[in-house]
């Protein structure tokens, strides 16, 4: 069985937001945006706004972490996949579940209680840092990059 064509995995807790997904889709050439989040997958009322925001001609799917692990290897060769997750923990669960992720771009992680800002768009807590460190130990390439044409911030800001 061929490996699924995962072009990029992106951590962005807004998922499909404004022009961001359009720019990222253009940059990597995906034709399927896979939103992987247990909460969103369980609530189809949240899907419509994201589907409307997706670029024309790009499919969107909403799966839980476990469903993604279970079916990612059934992707066809013509599916060029951009995976969107909300957190490093979800990305780590995918990798540990056998999803062949090689690179993760961190774009937006909301500030909040017990979260410290590391860039204007990324705030982390201790669990995020631990998950990112583990991903790095597993050989996953990590970068902080807001938009495809922006310069990446060093991952050392986080880990």
Regions found by a protein language model. Give the residues of each.
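Gly-rich Lys/Arg/Thr-decorated short loops/hinges at beta-loop-alpha junctions or inter-strand turns
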Residues: 1-5, 112-115
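Long, hydrophobic N-terminal alpha-helical segment
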Residues: 2-54, 59
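Structural motif
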Residues: 5-9, 31-34, 59-61, 79-83, ...
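Short basic, glycine-rich beta-strand/loop surfaces that mediate nucleic-acid
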Residues: 10, 49-61, 70-84, 117-124
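Generic hydrophobic/aromatic pocket-lining and core-packing "Φ" positions
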Residues: 21-22, 91, 132
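Short gly/pro/ser/thr-enriched loop/turn and capping motifs at secondary-structure boundaries
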Residues: 41-43, 68-69, 90, 111-114
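Ordered, amphipathic secondary-structure segments that act as subunit-interaction surfaces
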Residues: 61-107
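Glycine-rich, aromatic-bearing surface loops/beta-hairpins
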Residues: 97, 102-159
């Amino acid at each position: 069985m061929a490996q699924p064509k995962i072009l990029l995995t992106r951590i962005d807790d807004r998922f499909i937001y404004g022009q961001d997904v359009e720019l990222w889709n253009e940059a990597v050439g995906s034709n399927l945006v896979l939103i992987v989040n247990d909460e969103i997958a369980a609530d189809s009322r949240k899907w419509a706004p994201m589907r409307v925001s997706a670029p024309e001609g790009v499919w969107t799917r909403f799966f839980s972490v476990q469903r993604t692990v279970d079916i990612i290897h059934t992707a066809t060769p013509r599916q060029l996949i951009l995976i969107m997750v909300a957190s490093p923990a979800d990305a780590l669960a995918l990798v540990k579940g056998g999803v062949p992720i090689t690179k993760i771009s961190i774009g937006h992680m909301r500030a909040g209680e017990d979260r410290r800002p590391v860039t204007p768009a990324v705030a982390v807590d201790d669990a995020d840092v631990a998950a990112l460190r583990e991903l790095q130990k597993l050989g996953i390439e990590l970068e902080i990059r807001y938009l495809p044409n922006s310069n990446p911030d060093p991952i050392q800001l986080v880990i």
